[in-house]
Amino acid sequence: MLHTTPSGLLIIDKPQGVTSFDAVAAVRGALHIKKVGHAGTLDPMATGTLVIAFGHATRLLNAIVAHDKTYEATIRLGLRTTTDDAEGEVLVDDEARSRWQTLSAQLTEGGQSGEPTALPTASWQDLLTRTIATNFTGDIEQVPNTFSAIKINGQRAYDLAREGKDVELKPRPVTISEFTVLDIRSGFVAGEQTAEPLREDANTGAIPALDVDVRISCSSGTYIRALARDLGKELGVGGYLTRLRRTRVGRFALPDDASGLIAPEAMLDTRTHTVTAHTDQKTFTNREGQTVTRNKCVLDTPEGLAGDERRNWLLDHALTMEQAARGAMPALDITPEEASELRFGRRIERTISEPTAAIVPQTHDVAAIIERANAHQAKPVTVFPLA
């Protein structure tokens, strides 16, 4: 299928080790389109749903960013790190160690509180369920991570933190609609190996810990690293994130999403539109003349495709402008005459209560994003050219 000036969405399954911007750069290079953006940053350690818009669909990104999201993650309890994830340095916390020993004695029948103990997972299940239900479900206040992209007086929080400056972020309201414990594994962490799987044996210096696999559905702006930190803090033993995968952004979901929060008839069929990717390396010479090697994101396409063939394959796997608009916000079917009126900046006689995509269904023409003008009329706030 030949594509000339395309607009739409690609649902990228972002691999670990690259930034969201790396994925955007991969799409921009493959499609030869300058106007490309994404709906919500994923950290390099995270994988999963990255909604990337190109062409006129980039004007839908603000709506998509605001959608709720689902993640599957692993929270390690028993230690804290400087960044609240496995990329940070371990923080020695004698109070947390003492609390772990106390819990060990309480949750293990006949346990000795003076020795490192891998606690039985059955005992933890009940404690975690009660703690999550009481403190981390529904509407809560959350302090974002110090190492976050939030700006403070024009500077990113993570830049200030790396410079050793004090970073004070205010709590913000978030909503947790699901926080389910999927699996629990107990074991030991050897030294500074914060990202390694738990060991079964307690070598000298090993720290007892618990890996908790969870599924979390939450409002936009929720920091899963902060939930890991706060769960560990509430239990008194410390906690950080070792794995994070985003499986859903609003109605845009990966095939492995198991949240069940969106009715099947409302969920977009992104199975045939998801494009996987992998991490590779690129070597280049920077402006200082130094040879630098860093990770890059490579989109997975059939072997042998290149140039226009590869571009067209990706576009054939993208959501169309109409599919993108219907997934991004409420949609209203309009007539060709109404589409013409909207493109001239005129109001149409329609009753709506929220920003809505105005679409001519017969021609799949997304004419505009409209909003309420008065009780009986809607007005255009964003107009799209006729494709």
Curated annotation (Swiss-Prot):
Keywords: Isomerase, tRNA processing. It catalyses: uridine(55) in tRNA = pseudouridine(55) in tRNA. The active site is at D43. Gene3D superfamilies: Pseudouridine synthase, PUA domain. One of its GO terms (molecular function) is tRNA pseudouridine(55) synthase activity. Transmembrane segments: none annotated. Its EC number is 5.4.99.25. The keyword S-adenosyl-L-methionine does not apply. InterPro entries: PsdUridine_synth_cat_dom_sf (IPR020103), PsdUridine_synth_N (IPR002501), PUA_sf (IPR036974), tRNA_psdUridine_synth_fam2_C (IPR015225), tRNA_psdUridine_synth_TruB (IPR014780), TruB_C (IPR032819). GO terms for biological process: mRNA pseudouridine synthesis; tRNA pseudouridine synthesis. Signal peptide: none annotated. It is an enzyme of class 5 (isomerase). Pfam families: TruB_C, TruB_C_2, TruB_N. Belongs to the pseudouridine synthase TruB family. Type 1 subfamily. Responsible for synthesis of pseudouridine from uracil-55 in the psi GC loop of transfer RNAs. This is tRNA pseudouridine synthase B. It comes from Bifidobacterium longum (strain DJO10A). The gene is truB.
